[in-house]
């Protein structure tokens, strides 16, 4: 090789190295300059809904060093939520996670005022050009927990303390009962709706009322599972947690298992979309196969053969070879809701206004 060619090759290598440094540095500058604001309806240490979102953005921060977080907890819905979001934007936030169902309308209003800011809302049913909605489909996980509960119960009476009789929660209770009956045809699930997402006094009263009826496994669909699982523990009953992996420590002896949201990878994806300019408004629905949701570790009361049984069914769900709501299915009034051979799709859960045969209680 001639001296001229050697010098030329070195020059090209230097240019490529310099370009690589610029590109890497450019990505680092973007990460360093990104501010993400997240507002929570409750405490970030509630062992449930809010803690799951808080853990999600912390995982995002670990995945993307340099991203700055602005977190505010215990933000009421309505005007207060709007004010907090606007304050975050004034502090430089270009990403807002409005982490409560009731924040949707406030987020839409603020999004209209700040079109260059990207908003993300869990469970929303409306979007905007700069607002994405997302959620994790939970019936498969509830079915699996129903299987574990159906194998664990001594009385064949299971119970659920539920915030409100909305379709997605009814679907979860139905899935739980179907899972329980798949391994224990005598299992029944009694449900109490308390009318709110967080009220420890009402949660304890509902839990005790169910336990007084002979229920020996309690599940919960409210923001924080702590009160219900602790009430079960105090009365030597079993429990199934929801929302966060951190719930088990509050009732270790009676713990069967739980369902936990794992938002870290999704929040990392959102931040990267904003950083690289690929954001687009969309509605995202994932589940066990998408790593938005996981099963918490099983408790000591669950035998190895039950863990294996549940794990095998989980693999079927993830492979798409099994469906939760496969007919024939009747509601608890005896009306056929899903014909034999048909499947009620998970994408239509918003239309589920009934409780399946075996559930004691009414949605209205």
Each model region followed by its residue ranges:
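Bacterial N-terminal signal peptides that target proteins for export
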Residues: 2-16
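Initiator methionine at the very start of the polypeptide chain
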Residues: 1-2, 31
């Amino acid at each position: 090789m001639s001296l001229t060619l050697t010098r030329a090759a070195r020059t090209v290598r230097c240019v490529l190295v310099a370009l690589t440094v610029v590109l890497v540095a450019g990505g680092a500058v973007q990460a360093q300059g990104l501010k993400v604001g997240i507002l929570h309806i409750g405490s970030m240490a509630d062992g449930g809904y809010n803690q799951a979102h808080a853990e999600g953005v912390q995982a995002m921060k670990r995945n993307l060093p340099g991203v700055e977080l602005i977190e505010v907890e215990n933000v009421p819905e309505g005007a207060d939520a709007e004010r907090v979001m606007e304050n975050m934007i004034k502090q430089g936030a270009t990403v807002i996670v409005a982490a409560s169902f009731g924040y949707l309308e406030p987020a839409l209003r603020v999004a209209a005022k700040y079109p260059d800011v990207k908003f993300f809302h869990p469970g929303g049913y409306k979007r905007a050009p700069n607002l994405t909605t997302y959620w994790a489909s939970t019936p498969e996980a509830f079915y699996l927990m129903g299987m574990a509960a159906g194998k664990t119960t001594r009385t064949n009476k299971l119970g659920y303390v539920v915030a409100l009789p909305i379709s997605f929660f009814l679907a979860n209770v139905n899935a739980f009962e179907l899972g329980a009956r798949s391994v224990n045809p005598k299992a029944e699930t009694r449900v109490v709706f308390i009318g709110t997402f967080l009220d420890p006094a009402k949660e304890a009263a509902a839990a005790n009322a169910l336990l007084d009826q002979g229920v020996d496994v309690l599940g919960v669909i409210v923001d924080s599972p702590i009160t219900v699982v602790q009430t079960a523990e105090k009365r030597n009953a079993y429990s199934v947690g929801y929302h966060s992996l951190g719930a088990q420590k509050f009732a270790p002896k009676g713990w069967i298992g739980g369902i936990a949201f794992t938002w870290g990878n999704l929040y990392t994806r959102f931040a990267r979309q904003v950083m690289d300019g690929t954001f687009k408004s969309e509605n995202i629905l994932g589940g066990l196969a998408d790593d938005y949701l996981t099963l918490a570790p099983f408790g000591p009361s669950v035998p190895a053969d039950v863990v294996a049984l549940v794990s095998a069914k989980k693999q079927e769900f993830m492979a798409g070879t099994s469906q939760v709501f496969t007919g024939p299915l009747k509601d608890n009034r005896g009306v056929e809701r899903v014909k034999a051979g048909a499947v009620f799709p998970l994408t239509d859960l918003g239309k589920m206004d009934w409780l399946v045969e075996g559930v004691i209680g009414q949605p209205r």
